Amino acid sequence: MLRKLLFGGVTWLALCALAPDQAVAQRIASSDSLAVAAAVAAATQQYVQQAQPESVLFNGPEYVNRNPPSTIGHQYFGSADPQLGTITYRNAQFRGILLSYDLALDQVVMTYPSQAVTVQLVPEKIGGFSLGNHQFVRLLADSVAKSQAPTGFYEVLLAGPVSLLARHTKRVQQTTVQQNLRLEFRQTDQLFVRTASTMAPVDNLKDVLNLLPTHKAEVQRYARQQQLRFSGAQREASFSSALRYYASLPQ
């Protein structure tokens, strides 16, 4: 009997001792759950606020695609569908935004999630944007002395003191096939080299060498040794390789 009482007492004391710990653990778990829920709610609210019609992003005219449905291809960069991207707009950065880049109009378009609402963002308010791994900046024609580049958006292919950029455009080409008018989007990609003093289009190695202030012979020799090809599919990679080598030389 004594053994039973002692055992029962120990058991009861143990339960009493554990009860506060379990209560504390429950309170901690509940607190953690509330913290996680609050964080998720805050993140969701932040995105919704960024993408709501009254947001700073919805501060431009409605975008309307006026191209005939029969036109072959599309006018956008990469994909005809909106892509998740990041944009710097009115000195604020917005992530995870549905964006399209109309190459025919040189216009960035935002799509409101789950709604058929598209807005043209004001170009002058855009500092830059990204679509996937592609980074774009907006440059003014007079932002660089002796610039031969028009105002607009440029893809940054290589950043640095001497940078390589691409100006992508699309135009509708009209042809007649068996007495029927054929409309098709065609893309043009013009490369530019930007230095501290100028920005100009480049089509071959000679164009690049004319823009470099120093090390022209070294870059020319490197291009010959590496068998760089400044045309066709290897064009962008070859220009980037030559400029990376130039940047590695003592200035």
Where are these predicted regions, by residue range?
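General N-terminal leader/first-domain-start detector
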Residues: 2-3, 11, 23-93
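Long, compositionally biased interface segments
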Residues: 210-251
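A short, ordered amphipathic alpha-helix with a cationic face
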Residues: 73, 195, 208-213
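Aromatic-patch recognition
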Residues: 77-206
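C-terminal segment of classical bacterial N-terminal signal peptides
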Residues: 15-23
